[in-house]
Amino acid sequence: MQQLQNVIESAFERRADITPANVDTVTREAVNQVIALLDSGALRVAEKIDGQWVTHQWLKKAVLLSFRINDNQVIDGAESRYFDKVPMKFADYDEARFQKEGFRVVPPAAVRQGAFIARNTVLMPSYVNIGAYVDEGTMVDTWATVGSCAQIGKNVHLSGGVGIGGVLEPLQANPTIIEDNCFIGARSEVVEGVIVEEGSVISMGVYLGQSTKIYDRETGEVFYGRVPAGSVVVSGNLPSKDGKYSLYCAVIVKKVDAKTRGKVGINELLRTID
């Protein structure tokens, strides 16, 4: 694996000079191998190690290199044709392959090659970009978008129209992460490498970026870039210091543990916030 990483790192340093016409065989094979490993879930751009999320920047570099080494080509879909550098993940799938891998894909859902989809996942008409990892039992609902290299945990529900940001550039940025057992409400956006920790519930229409204040109304604490585990979050506003205006924020209205979450439905958690 180290040899593969070395090839990618070296090629990335000279990426400006690489084209589909002049790319060498070693680089092309290394990039294609990484994309295949991401596609199968054998590798992932970010993973939790000893309780901390670690981003493997060289894998992101491989994804970016894939755009340098490939020309656009006509790509056939179920009801459309495309013209792009990245093939569609399911282009060669037959019924036996879908049965073996154990997930559902509802037309016209689109998944790029290099994204991993785990068993018991349901993809409604949605979009999953290259490098993303969608774990077991997750629902990606209609018109939801999972951005490049985003990490989606087990038993997550991404509601209709949710946007999970992709982060390929700048390379020092970390991917957006939704941990296990989270619910993201309709039309919410989580971007810029924000981490929504395990068991959190994000209400409809909440927007979370690195500069968004995430205010805990019980403690007065303000978080940036991270929703603490078990949080129930709604849209809100905080007043300016001079009291002349207010600015958007996200508000943690309560905390729930796994036991409470198991007994109470998502809708109930969001309705009883007073």
Swiss-Prot record:
Localization, UniProt: Cytoplasm
Known catalytic reactions: (S)-2,3,4,5-tetrahydrodipicolinate + succinyl-CoA + H2O = (S)-2-succinylamino-6-oxoheptanedioate + CoA
UniProt cross-references to Pfam families, sorted A to Z: Hexapep_2 (PF14602), THDPS_N_2 (PF14805)
Q: What is its main location?
A: cytoplasm
User: Which InterPro entries does the entry link to?
Assistant: DapD_Trfase_Hexpep_rpt_fam (IPR005664), Hexapep (IPR001451), Hexapep_transf_CS (IPR018357), THP_succinylTrfase_dom1 (IPR023180), THP_succinylTrfase_N_sf (IPR037133), Trimer_LpxA-like_sf (IPR011004)
Q: Name one GO cellular component term.
A: cytoplasm
EC number(s) on record? Answer: 2.3.1.117
PROSITE patterns for this protein: HEXAPEP_TRANSFERASES (PS00101)
Any one Gene Ontology BP term: diaminopimelate biosynthetic process
Residues that span the membrane, as ranges? none
* Keywords annotated in UniProt: Acyltransferase, Amino-acid biosynthesis, Cytoplasm, Diaminopimelate biosynthesis, Lysine biosynthesis, Repeat, Transferase
Query: Any idea which positions bind substrate?
Result: R104, D141
Q: In which pathway does it act?
A: Amino-acid biosynthesis; L-lysine biosynthesis via DAP pathway; LL-2,6-diaminopimelate from (S)-tetrahydrodipicolinate (succinylase route): step 1/3
**What GO molecular function annotation could you give as one example from this UniProt entry?**
nucleotidyltransferase activity
Q: Which domain of life is it from?
A: Bacteria
Tagged with keyword Transferase: yes
Protein family (similarity comment)? Belongs to the transferase hexapeptide repeat family.
Subunit structure, briefly? Homotrimer.
HAMAP family recorded for this chain?
Answer: DapD (MF_00811)
Could you tell me what this protein is called? Answer: 2,3,4,5-tetrahydropyridine-2,6-dicarboxylate N-succinyltransferase
Q: What organism is the protein native to?
A: Klebsiella pneumoniae subsp. pneumoniae (strain ATCC 700721 / MGH 78578)
Q: What is the lineage of its organism?
A: Bacteria, Pseudomonadati, Pseudomonadota, Gammaproteobacteria, Enterobacterales
